[in-house]
């Protein structure tokens, strides 16, 4: 019988950038023994692998995902699996089970969840998990206890015999939890289920240096050699961390937002998007971070709105997580009542990017008395966005913007 797993997220910087603040970034900053820090390497490696697979499957489409959301949802699901299914799932997420126990993995996600929940008052943060269970199914008490303990997941009874009503109820639940920003999660999906797992993330933060609202102008965006679209192009003239990479064909800037996060905007040279994406790794990010210099930059970035639903089943199978979708799936730690297998792993993402920031002293950008000509950097062709929480080193979001319209 089918089991559906959904992850959904929202990054909506209508007041800057939607993000998370963990805790004091100076506290035990180098203490990599913290449970959540033990996840960092595996989570980032999984993030780039998943991103590259999705990009390859949709070479001309916008891509926007929250890797940490997907990792957390799949890790939670692993609590209900046994045997080869469990080992394959955790190894597919990048964990070496000879080096890290399953308990340590789940403790790491538990601490990560708790840190994300400790957002600053200037941020809005909602992150959660929910399990929707058909009334005919008896959930094993151990599974219910584990997902509540590690992932603070709610368990809600549903009547999946009436699929239309059940899907509306789940849509309503997610809509309420994400303050009306994630809607119609089940739109266009007609597969009945007896158990649905949902992971959702909603968060809002602010640019430390907002874009100048009055400077936004309509400009050309060159999608490809034959397609040009008009976009509202934002402008920020300030001191920004900038790098013209000598090894990869790209330029990039790193910008901070209120909290513990950082965002990279990467502009590949014309026709070199795939070259840059292929090189994305932890080593590349470390090299970029070390090479950035504070520069006077006139930065032009288009206002972006992207919405998409991704069925991750084929991608996960390519990445070695295959048992979930076959009759070999072993979900015997969820219930003894039925033979379950995953029919879908769906991830819904929404991205909006605009100018606004916190209206406080020192947060409206930097006015410069230029002694040299500023670098002019126009994101008027396909580009990459990466957002990290630099306390937990979580890969919050990865995007490829092919067409911002």
Swiss-Prot record:
Matches recorded under CDD domains: serpinA6_CBG
Binding site for cortisol: 254, 286, 390, 393
Keywords associated with the record: Disease variant, Glycoprotein, Lipid-binding, Secreted, Signal, Steroid-binding, Transport
GO cellular component: extracellular exosome; extracellular region; extracellular space
Signal peptide region: 1-22
Post-translational modification comment from the UniProt entry: N-glycosylated; binds 5 oligosaccharide chains.
GO biological process entries: glucocorticoid biosynthetic process
Gene3D superfamilies to which the protein is assigned, alphabetical: Alpha-1-antitrypsin, domain 1 (2.30.39.10), Antithrombin, subunit I, domain 2 (3.30.497.10)
Annotated site, Conserved cysteine within steroid binding domain, chain positions: 250
List of glycosylated residues: 31, 96, 176, 260, 330, 369
InterPro entries in alphabetical order: Serpin_CS, Serpin_dom, Serpin_fam, Serpin_sf, Serpin_sf_1, Serpin_sf_2
GO-annotated molecular function: molecular carrier activity; serine-type endopeptidase inhibitor activity; steroid binding
Expression sites by tissue: Plasma; synthesized in liver. Has also been identified in a number of glycocorticoid responsive cells.
Subcellular location: Secreted
Known function: Major transport protein for glucocorticoids and progestins in the blood of almost all vertebrate species.
Protein name: Corticosteroid-binding globulin
Provenance organism: Homo sapiens
């Amino acid at each position: 019988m089918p089991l559906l797993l959904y992850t959904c997220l929202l990054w909506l910087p209508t007041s800057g950038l939607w993000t998370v603040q963990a805790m004091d970034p100076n506290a035990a900053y180098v203490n990599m023994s913290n449970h959540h820090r033990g996840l960092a390497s595996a989570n980032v490696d999984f993030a780039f692998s998943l991103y590259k697979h999705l990009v390859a499957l949709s070479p001309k489409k916008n891509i926007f995902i929250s890797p940490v959301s997907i990792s957390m949802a799949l890790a939670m699901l692993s609590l209900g699996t046994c045997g080869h299914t469990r080992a394959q799932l955790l190894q597919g997420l990048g964990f070496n089970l000879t080096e890290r126990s399953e308990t340590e993995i789940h403790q790491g996600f538990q601490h990560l969840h708790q840190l994300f929940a400790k957002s600053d008052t200037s941020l809005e943060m909602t992150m959660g998990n929910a399990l929707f269970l058909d009334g005919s199914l008896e959930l094993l008490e151990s599974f219910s206890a584990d997902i509540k303990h590690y992932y603070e997941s709610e368990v809600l009874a549903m009547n999946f015999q009436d699929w239309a009503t059940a899907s509306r109820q789940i849509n309503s639940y997610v809509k309420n939890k994400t303050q009306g920003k994630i809607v119609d999660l089940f739109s266009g999906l007609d597969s009945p289920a007896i158990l649905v797992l949902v992971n959702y993330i909603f968060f809002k933060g602010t640019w430390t240096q907002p874009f100048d609202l009055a400077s936004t102008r309509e400009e050309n965006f060159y999608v490809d050699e034959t397609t040009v679209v008009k976009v509202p192009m934002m402008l920020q003239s300030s001191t920004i961390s900038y790098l013209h990479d000598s090894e990869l064909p790209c330029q990039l800037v790193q910008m901070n937002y209120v909290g513990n996060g950082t965002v990279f905007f990467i502009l590949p040279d014309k026709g070199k998007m795939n070259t840059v994406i292929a090189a994305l790794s932890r080593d590349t990010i470390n090299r970029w971070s070390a090479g950035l210099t504070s520069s006077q930059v006139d930065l032009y970035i288009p206002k972006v709105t992207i919405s998409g639903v991704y069925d991750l089943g084929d991608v996960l199978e390519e990445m070695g997580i295959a048992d979930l979708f076959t009759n070999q799936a072993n979900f015997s730690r969820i219930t003894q009542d039925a033979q379950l297998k995953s029919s879908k792993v769906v991830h819904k993402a929404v991205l909006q990017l605009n100018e606004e920031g916190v209206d406080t002293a020192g947060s409206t950008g930097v006015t410069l008395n230029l002694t040299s000509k500023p670098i002019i950097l126009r994101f008027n062709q396909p580009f990459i966005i990466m957002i990290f929480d630099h306390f937990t080193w979580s890969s919050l979001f990865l995007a490829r913007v092919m067409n911002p319209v």
